[in-house]
UniProtKB/Swiss-Prot annotation:
UniProt entry tagged with the keyword Ribosomal protein: yes
GO biological process: translation
Cited InterPro entries: Ribosomal_bS18, Ribosomal_bS18_CS, Ribosomal_bS18_sf
Chain's role: Binds as a heterodimer with protein bS6 to the central domain of the 16S rRNA, where it helps stabilize the platform of the 30S subunit.
Assembly: Part of the 30S ribosomal subunit. Forms a tight heterodimer with protein bS6.
Name of the molecule in the record: Small ribosomal subunit protein bS18
Keywords of this entry: Ribonucleoprotein, Ribosomal protein, RNA-binding, rRNA-binding
GO function term, MF aspect, one: small ribosomal subunit rRNA binding
PROSITE patterns attached to this UniProt entry: RIBOSOMAL_S18
A cellular component annotation (GO) from this entry: cytosolic small ribosomal subunit
Gene that produces this protein: rpsR
Top-level taxon: Bacteria
Lineage, broadest ranks: Bacteria, Pseudomonadati, Pseudomonadota, Gammaproteobacteria, Vibrionales
Similarity section: Belongs to the bacterial ribosomal protein bS18 family.
Length: 75
């Protein structure tokens, strides 16, 4: 049988030394939401709890300011 290699999860924000996650940085925030617009959980992304809270807050703020969509484009 074939063995599957799982990539080790790590927190990108800790590795880069980020102090605060900016809600205006839409390119970074898009990596942490699904196609349907949901916030991806930390058990999938490997983000530490401190940064997951900041990430959720930043995504919600950018949604409120219409920088990110609440849902996908359903017609």
């Amino acid at each position: 049988m074939a063995r599957f290699f799982r990539r080790r999860k790590f927190c990108r924000f800790t590795a880069e030394g980020v102090q605060e996650i900016d809600y205006k940085d839409v390119a970074t925030l898009k990596n942490y939401i699904t196609e349907a617009g949901k916030i991806v959980p930390s058990r999938i992304t490997g983000t530490r709890a401190k940064y997951q809270r900041q990430l959720a807050r930043a995504i919600k703020r950018s949604r409120y300011l219409a920088l990110l969509p609440y849902t996908d484009k359903h017609l």
